[in-house]
Regions:
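C-terminal all-alpha effector/ligand-binding and dimerization domain
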Residues: 69-76, 89, 115-177
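Short linear motifs at protein or domain termini
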Residues: 1-42, 48, 52, 176-177
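Short loop-to-helix capping motifs
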Residues: 103-105, 151-152
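Residue-level detector of well-ordered alpha-helical segments, enriched
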Residues: 34, 38, 42, 64, ...
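Amphipathic alpha-helical segments enriched in hydrophobic/aromatic residues interleaved with Lys/Arg
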Residues: 57-81
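Short basic (Lys/Arg) and small-residue
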Residues: 98
Length: 177
């Protein structure tokens, strides 16, 4: 099955990226701030690409766009009531779904490789976040979702920027690896 071989190759490439990023961190040639900058850039570009390529010229196309974004909306709703480790799972799923909206497979591979580097740090921060910090983060996710629905790149980019400059983001400045 050719499709299966394609998935195998994509997974191998993703693991290779992850290995390179891990080695850079291990050798102190990179740091968590640079990883976060890459994640932020991937998400901003994914948002822009999704908005730019969305066909909303007809009512049917608009309905299709809303259906494409529905998983993001459901994730945001679930996030509102989440606690503990469920926060981590939903946050990760939201970021993965955001990247998927771009339909850029390379972005998805890079996002997965980069996110794997900081899973533990993010898990520690999200599970320890106060309810107020968590709700601020959920509000960022809601704004990102709404900006995609409304095709408002400026609002979406501002929300992504805010997401990565949260009050508890300083807690993430811990060594990785």
């Amino acid at each position: 099955c050719v499709h299966g071989k394609g998935n195998f190759l994509v997974n191998q490439i993703g693991e290779s990226f992850s290995s390179v990023f891990s080695m850079l961190l291990f050798l102190k040639q990179s740091n968590f701030d640079e990883v976060q900058q890459l994640r932020r850039g991937l998400e901003m570009q994914s948002l822009l690409l999704a908005i730019q390529t969305a066909d909303c010229t007809t009512a049917a196309a608009q309905a299709q766009w809303r259906q494409t974004l529905e998983p993001l909306g459901k994730l945001v709703e679930s996030m509102r009531q989440a606690t503990g480790h469920k926060r981590v799972t939903l946050d990760s799923a939201f970021h993965e779904a955001l990247i998927q909206c771009s339909a850029n497979r390379l972005f998805a591979v890079l996002q997965k490789a980069v996110s794997s580097l900081c899973e533990a740090a993010i898990e520690n921060v999200l599970t320890a976040a106060t309810d107020a910090q968590w709700q601020t983060l959920v509000d960022c996710h809601e704004t990102i979702y709404q900006s995609l629905l409304n095709r408002d790149a400026q609002a979406g980019m501002a929300a992504i920027d805010q997401h990565y400059t949260q009050p508890f983001s300083d807690s993430l400045n811990t060594p990785l690896g």
